Structures are given as C-alpha cells and as structure tokens.
Regions:
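Extended, well-ordered alpha-helical segments in internal regulatory regions
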Residues: 90-108
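Acidic, Ser/Thr/Gly/Pro-rich intrinsically disordered interaction regions
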Residues: 1-49, 53, 72-82, 106, ...
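Short linear interaction motif-like sites in intrinsically disordered regions of transcription factors
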Residues: 60-63, 100, 171
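Hydrophobic/aromatic-rich structural module bridging two neighboring secondary-structure elements via a short loop
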Residues: 60-89
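Amphipathic, well-ordered alpha-helical segments in soluble domains
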Residues: 43-53, 57-60, 90, 97
Length: 270
C-alpha cells in the first residue's frame, strides 16, 4: 500500500536554528499547539500502521496455518477486518484531535464563572497541564449545539480562518461512510463484511409470506445475517486510503499552516 503524502511533514519541527537575541519566548499557546500537533501526528501514524497491516502476508504471526483453505481465507479476512476497523478508529481520532489542536491554539483555555482565563505567558508545569486538561474538556464537534467555536470566533477573530476550516471540513465529513462506519463500530455493533459472509454456510431455513391478493412473496427475517449492516471490506479499505490521501492530509496540512501563520509559535518549542 502506497500513500501520496508523508504524514511526518505535519509534525512540529524536529530541530531548529535561531538567534537567541530577539527570539520570541514560548507561551502557553505555543506549547499547547505544538503538543497537540505532535499527538495528532502520532495517532495519524498509528492509522497508517494498521492500514499497512491490511496487506500483510505475515500470517504466521497471527495464527497457526490450517489445512482448510476456506477456513484460512476466513481467518485472513477476519484479521484484515480488525486491522481496518482499528485504522478507522485512529483516522476518526485524528479528525477529533484537529478540533482540539485549533481550540488550544486560541488565546484562552476556558471560561470559569464567566471570566475569561488568560493562558498567555509562561506557566509552571503543573499549572500548564491543568489548563490544557481544562481546555480539552471544552472541545466538542464543531456543529454541536453548545460548541465553543462560534464564541472563539467572536473573542479571537484572528482565528476565524482556522475555525472556518474545521467547521467546513466537519460539515462534509460527518455525512461520509468513514464517519458513519466509525460511529457504528463505536456505538452500535460490528459490521458484516461481504467477503466474509460469502464463506459462511448457507442459512438453515427461510420463511416466506405470500400475499393472497397480489401473489407477491415476501421473505421474512429469520437469520441474524438478515439484519447485519453489511459492506465490502476491500472497498472500505480502498475508500479509507483515498480518504487519507485526498481528504484528511490536505485538510490537516492547510489547518496547521493556517494556525502557524496566525500563532507564529516560538522557535524554542520543538
């Protein structure tokens, strides 16, 4: 499996050179932003790892070989489906982290009893951790009824371009199969994959009802397979790769570049 983009180009700088004289000192915004930027890339990397595993040929690592070719094919597909679902979870986590990445870059962490909390300047480690945890708790989806982003746009209008990017992305992404399948796996159950279902034995029985007036015959649900949420594993893996290449990476690249341009983080944070 080949991807178009190097995700590590999205990460914070691994090394920098700068003149100490006149260099901008880091503040909490810089630290929080770079921290979330790095965490986002780590989760993105995990998604890629499991995508690569969907094409593994190292099956002896996962189970002992069997003489039954049908059973062996089923094992391959079942494990590949687990790798796919794990990658699906990580990709969706990356999307959610992108909201936090934007939120913590803004010039306040949270409101306490209606008072704006200023997170500029340098903080003791314990205070900085507490502020970041507090900020993380405030993040919701960009279109949730009580989302913080409209308020952020009023308080920090310089961040409007970045906030609009995450809202526009979410409005499109939330209706895609990538998000719908993630929500199904997370909250509702496990999907059935057509490639695996084809290998299962046929149903034991079928129940049919005939309409005496029209003669129309209707099959009644009598097997658990009748009510499964089913789709193709191969097509889903391909769709996830295309989402990575053509949707997720370009969105994150633009978002990070936009925030960096607004925030101008200190070169001392890397």
């Amino acid at each position: 499996m080949e991807f178009k983009n190097d995700i590590f180009t999205l990460d914070k700088p691994s090394s920098v050179k700068f003149d100490l004289v006149g260099a901008k000192l880091p503040n909490s915004n810089d630290i929080f932003f770079r921290s979330k930027q790095h965490e986002l890339v780590e989760q993105y990397s995990a998604a890629r790892i499991f995508m690569y595993e969907t094409e593994t040929d190292d099956w002896n690592h996962w189970f002992n070989p069997v003489d039954d070719s049908t059973a062996e094919e089923a094992f391959h597909l079942i494990y590949r489906s687990h790798f796919y679902e794990t990658a699906l979870f990580y990709y969706n986590a990356v999307v959610d982290i992108s909201w936090t990445l934007c939120y913590v870059a803004v010039e306040f962490a949270c409101s306490k009893k209606g008072v704006r909390v200023n997170i500029t300047g340098m903080k003791p480690i314990e205070d900085a951790c507490e502020l970041l945890r507090s900020a993380e708790r405030n993040v919701t989806s960009p279109t949730a009824e009580e989302n913080p982003f409209e308020y952020l746009k009023m308080m920090c209008p310089e961040f409007i371009p970045a906030i609009d990017q995450i809202i526009d992305f979410w409005n499109t992404f939330s209706a895609t199969d990538v998000r719908k399948r993630y929500n199904f796996c997370k909250h509702k159950g496990r999907p059935a994959y057509s490639e695996i279902e084809k290998l299962r034995p046929g149903r034991l029985m079928g129940i049919y009802v005939e309409n005496k007036t029209s003669g129309e015959v209707t099959q009644i649900a009598s097997d658990i397979g009748d009510v499964k949420y089913e789709f193709s594993l191969e097509e889903a893996i391909q769709e996830l790769q295309e989402f990575d290449d053509n949707v997720l990476f370009p969105y994150l690249k633009k978002l990070i570049e936009t925030i960096e341009g607004i925030l101008d983080p200190s070169p001392m944070v890397f």
